[in-house]
Amino acid sequence: MTQWEVVIGLETHAQLSTVSKIFSGASTQFGAQPNTQACPVDLALPGVLPVLNRGAVERAIRFGLAIGATVAPRSVFARKNYFYPDLPKGYQISQYEIPVVQGGQITIQVPANEKAGKQAYSKTVNLTRAHLEEDAGKSLHEDFAGMTGIDLNRAGTPLLEIVTEPEMRSAAEAVAYAKALHGLVMWLGICDGNMQEGSFRCDANVSVRPVGQEKFGTRAEIKNLNSFRFLEDAINYEVRRQIELIEDGGEVVQETRLYDPDKRETRSMRSKEDAHDYRYFPDPDLMPLVIGADWIARVKGEMPELPAAMQQRFIEQYGVSAYDAGVLTSTKAMAEYFEALVAKAGAANAKLAANWLMGDVSSQLNRDGIDIDACPVSAAQLALVLQRIADGTISNKIAKEIFVTIWDEKAADEGAADRIIEAKGLKQISDTGALEAIIDEVLAANAKSVEEFRAGKDKAFNALVGQAMKATKGKANPQQVNELLKKKLG
């Protein structure tokens, strides 16, 4: 039986976070009434000329520097010719032979798959290029009975199309890459990453070939995948479809396909064009884009610390594990919250801060369906909770209750933890004399558990600890309870 190898390359369109469009001054704001953000340039009225948006170029430079690519000192805009109702000019301004960003790579972390018996691993994906281009408009097929409306608000919106080499070998790798790229463009501030609004969408080029064969199989391109789940499902379906087709004696044709999320399958859209079908030629209305070394140096000086560098710094500076550092730098907002938390709680509490951020805080964020930048508990408020754990004022269990109270109250005061501790009488009982008296009562009331422990049953000891904590309503210092019980039980 033939063993098949999957070959995947991704083309990702990241909408650049400029206020105006790439070749006009019209707004890029999402959600406006149709055709209210389309100026004469976007409408392709006679006599208009495009003017390149400097901000779009700087965002492309920033991306190129972040992935270790070559930023071309001279790149050229080209006309990509095709007819579609939402493309008023009859061509799209893009880059073809000389893109602004050339090469580069992104390291991805592919998670373990227990069902398939695969362990987690890292992989470096090489990029072919990233080029600037304008978006087309939007066809409104469902708004008019028997007709199609055209909304040109999106026409001319700046895009950075990021193209990988065909190096990914599974849907899991493709999704890991897409997530890494999504996180990076948001970290750099060049794209808002809103997949529902179409700010970040992927086209997947998928083919299969017998294991060991060098020649690529015929590829199908799946267009406009705007969620990671859709990307994974579409690739998995397409791989199965191609293998079944070949094994049944058929041939895969080069075509563009669409993914139907309701049926969880791909369907044919049109035959896939080659580059020569678009009749690319340099745009005579635009000068070559010249990027000097001084411009690159200035953009580099304004770059934020990159995730990989920050991850390594967290390991060295705060003593957290590589895994924890990876989670803490998963988004820029998460990393900033962690650093603010440690700054307030003290470096000695860095590991405690990391555990809380990845545990209780993340759990509450998931419960409410919000991101860390919308967290109702500020870093200063949480830092005080952690300090009260560290100085023995409260137990970890009580701290969780206080945290949830601050969260639900949406308290504004930085000293909320101390206020709640005082108001509810939540201070941990650390007085040895008081604890000894409580433990004596627990031992007297639980003679059977005492006998079982002395007979070698360790579970009985845990039962006694539980009874002591219950007697103090969770306010006892657990460590002291353990020590005193061991002392009294001999």
Curated annotation (Swiss-Prot):
InterPro entries in alphabetical order: Asn/Gln-tRNA_amidoTrfase_suB/E, Asn/Gln-tRNA_Trfase_suB/E_cat, Asn/Gln_amidotransferase, Asn/Gln_tRNA_amidoTrase-B-like, GatB, GatB_C_1, GatB_Yqey_C_2, Gln-tRNA_amidoTrfase_suB_CS
Gene3D superfamilies: 1.10.10.410, GatB domain, N-terminal subdomain
Keyword Glycoprotein (UniProt): no
Coiled-coil ranges from the UniProt annotation: none
GO terms for MF: asparaginyl-tRNA synthase (glutamine-hydrolyzing) activity; ATP binding; glutaminyl-tRNA synthase (glutamine-hydrolyzing) activity
Reactions accelerated catalytically: L-glutamyl-tRNA(Gln) + L-glutamine + ATP + H2O = L-glutaminyl-tRNA(Gln) + L-glutamate + ADP + phosphate + H(+); L-aspartyl-tRNA(Asn) + L-glutamine + ATP + H2O = L-asparaginyl-tRNA(Asn) + L-glutamate + ADP + phosphate + 2 H(+)
EC class (word): ligase
Entries under SUPFAM superfamilies matching the protein: GatB/YqeY motif (SSF89095), Glutamine synthetase/guanido kinase (SSF55931)
Pfam family, one: GatB_Yqey
NCBIfam families assigned: gatB, PRK05477.1-2, PRK05477.1-4, PRK05477.1-5
Assembly and interaction partners: Heterotrimer of A, B and C subunits.
Main function: Allows the formation of correctly charged Asn-tRNA(Asn) or Gln-tRNA(Gln) through the transamidation of misacylated Asp-tRNA(Asn) or Glu-tRNA(Gln) in organisms which lack either or both of asparaginyl-tRNA or glutaminyl-tRNA synthetases. The reaction takes place in the presence of glutamine and ATP through an activated phospho-Asp-tRNA(Asn) or phospho-Glu-tRNA(Gln).
Name assigned to this protein: Aspartyl/glutamyl-tRNA(Asn/Gln) amidotransferase subunit B
Species of provenance: Burkholderia pseudomallei (strain K96243)
Gene: gatB
